């Protein structure tokens, strides 16, 4: 499935124009006296749809009026991504919003949060609990470590998003600030806070992050990715 990457203005328009929904699943007993609208899916004694369409049906329940409501949002503008046809490994518990681009053989681990407009290149791994803000971009064959944050930018629309290059390793709990670009082949050490652009093939560390060395054979060996983890 191909998703066209959106500009900031397109994302803002998408959110602003979207019908805000409170999606619910309702399990009920008794009989519904009112007709079920087309916007509501009824499977046996379970209803799926927007709360504002389902609530009136429950008011008119006949006989047994018990019901249970399950919900996970309120007036949400952006649905979660339909992952069924994405050629990537996405583990349970990852939260990925609509209009996210995910390349072939990428890996999204449990607890990762990926906001609207983000782009993840082929073969890239987003580790547990990592956060990719709106419009953040990661190239191919990179690794975003557990708990790392790539800050998002949707407003102001003129601001530049985070851009991570190809073959980059961002260590656990590192933070890359809005607008920063990290060049191909570079390494961001665990816990670093990156406030300025990082050139290609260097290691940065510290708060704020500074270049501590150029990539050498020893660093490449320590940061090599495992292709077996990306097999589908």
Swiss-Prot record:
What is the protein's known function? Answer: Catalyzes the transfer of an acetyl group from acetyl-CoA to tetrahydrodipicolinate.
Q: Which Gene3D superfamilies match?
A: Hexapeptide repeat proteins (2.160.10.10), Malonyl-CoA ACP transacylase, ACP-binding (3.30.70.250)
Name the PROSITE patterns for this protein: HEXAPEP_TRANSFERASES (PS00101)
Gene Ontology biological-process entries: diaminopimelate biosynthetic process; lysine biosynthetic process via diaminopimelate
The pathway where this protein functions is: Amino-acid biosynthesis; L-lysine biosynthesis via DAP pathway; LL-2,6-diaminopimelate from (S)-tetrahydrodipicolinate (acetylase route): step 1/3
Source domain of life is Bacteria
- Record-linked HAMAP family: DapH
Question: Which cysteine pairs are joined by S-S bonds?
Answer: none
Write the signal peptide boundaries. Answer: none
Query: Is-annotated flag, keyword Repeat?
Result: yes
What this protein is called in its record is 2,3,4,5-tetrahydropyridine-2,6-dicarboxylate N-acetyltransferase
UniProt catalytic activity? (S)-2,3,4,5-tetrahydrodipicolinate + acetyl-CoA + H2O = L-2-acetamido-6-oxoheptanedioate + CoA
Q: Say which family it is in.
A: Belongs to the transferase hexapeptide repeat family. DapH subfamily.
Organism encoding this protein? Streptococcus uberis (strain ATCC BAA-854 / 0140J)
Q: Which InterPro entries match?
A: DapH, DapH_N, Hexapep, Hexapep_transf_CS, Trans_hexapeptide_repeat, Trimer_LpxA-like_sf
């Amino acid at each position: 499935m191909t998703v066209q990457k959106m500009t900031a203005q397109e994302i803002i328009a998408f959110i602003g124009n979207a019908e805000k929904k409170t999606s619910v699943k309702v399990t009920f007993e008794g009989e519904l006296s009112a007709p079920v609208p087309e916007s509501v899916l009824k499977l046996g004694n379970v209803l799926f749809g927007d709360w504002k369409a389902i609530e009136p049906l429950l008011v008119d329940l006949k006989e047994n009026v018990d019901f249970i409501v399950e919900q996970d949002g309120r007036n949400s503008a952006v649905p979660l991504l339909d992952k069924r046809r994405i050629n990537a490994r996405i583990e349970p518990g990852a939260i990925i919003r609509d209009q996210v681009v995910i390349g072939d053989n990428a890996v999204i681990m449990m607890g990762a949060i990926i906001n609207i407009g983000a782009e993840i290149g082929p073969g890239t791994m987003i580790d547990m609990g990592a956060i990719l803000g709106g419009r953040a971009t990661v190239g191919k064959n990179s690794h975003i470590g557990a708990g790392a944050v790539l800050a998002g930018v949707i407003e102001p629309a003129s601001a530049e998003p985070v851009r991570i290059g190809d073959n980059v390793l961002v260590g656990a709990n590192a933070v890359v600030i809005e607008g920063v670009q990290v060049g191909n082949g570079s390494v961001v050490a665990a816990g670093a806070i990156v406030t300025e652009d990082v050139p290609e093939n260097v290691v940065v560390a510290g708060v704020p992050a500074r270049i501590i060395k150029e990539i050498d054979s020893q660093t490449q060996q320590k940061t090599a990715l495992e292709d077996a983890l990306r097999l589908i």
